[in-house]
Amino acid sequence: MMNHKRKLVWLIVFALLLSVTSIETGFAKPKKKKEALTGTPVLWERPNDIASRDLYLGPGGAAMRPDLRRITFIKEEKGGYSKKYRVKDGAGREWVVKIGKEAQSETSAVRLLYGLGYLTEVNYLVPRVTIPGKGTFSNVRFEARPDNLKRAGEWKWKQNPFVGTPELQGLKILMALINNWDLKDSNNVILKDGNELHYAISDLGATFGHASTTPLFWRFTRSRNSPANYAKSNFFEKVKGDRVVLHFGGKNRGLMKDISIQDAQWIGSLLSQLSDRQIRDAFRAANYTPGQINLLTGEVRERTNELLSLRPAVQIGRN
């Protein structure tokens, strides 16, 4: 009996020694180290051509439009609110197509951000397309997956190289202006382009709708891609000293607590350089109806004017 126990103990010791030795000698599979990101972070590039930017074709221009002569299904993309597929077009380029309610709103949102100098994804709205084996769909967003860009993870709203800068403050205000209530870090992406790290918002689908500022009703009242709801929603609430209180009912509401009048006027001055025709083109590119284009364009212009008209609140009496 004792001999049996001793043999068992020695077998256990031998097994442990073998496992330690295998780790030290490299037999065990080493953990893959996370590659450190190197490059110059870029969120926004100062544009000198806002008034002439093409908001119909957007950041990809005519050159990057998908070749629809032949579409090949690759796989289904998991995650998110909308159904998504990875496909290859007739030129052999890969795309992630988004089907459903978010396709139109995201297409327009990307174009407005691009028009002001923000780094964005490249996308196009295709009114009707057949994906072999999956079906025929209307209003499909094609988002490019170019070979020269490496998707290098997400970035955080509260921890990034641009905290406190006008461009990040302006981006926050833009999110409230287009009613993007889904401000999750997981909706952001870093795109490595050569020696630059492009900080972009990868999911702008939950825009041009409405979300209540009352926490209890937030999940029941929120909408996306609803021009009528967007036009009826509020944007600006009040000025407290030199701070701006925006009507924002989305996730990460704390992001909107440090907006100054100077921040608002900075982004407002950029928006004011867009013509009504350019703003209309951003919505026309997403295949909205003429009536919806008028409604959305008018609301964006009205909100721009609100930003430009803000002045510090006058305090009367003692503090």
Q: Predicted regions span which residues?
A:
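Regulatory N- and C-terminal appendages and interdomain linkers associated
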Residues: 5-73, 92, 276-319
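Conserved, well-structured beta-alpha core segment at the onset of a catalytic domain
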Residues: 6, 19-24, 91-94, 100-101, ...
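Conserved ATP-binding subdomain of kinase catalytic cores across diverse folds
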Residues: 59-158
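Extracytoplasmic/secreted envelope proteins and their assembly/folding machinery
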Residues: 84, 106, 110, 171-174, ...
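Solvent-exposed, acidic/flexible segments
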Residues: 99-106, 163-170, 177, 181, ...
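Conserved kinase catalytic-core segment
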Residues: 111, 153-223
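Short polybasic/polar patches that bind polyanions
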Residues: 114, 179, 284
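C-terminal catalytic region of ATP-dependent kinase domains
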Residues: 197-319
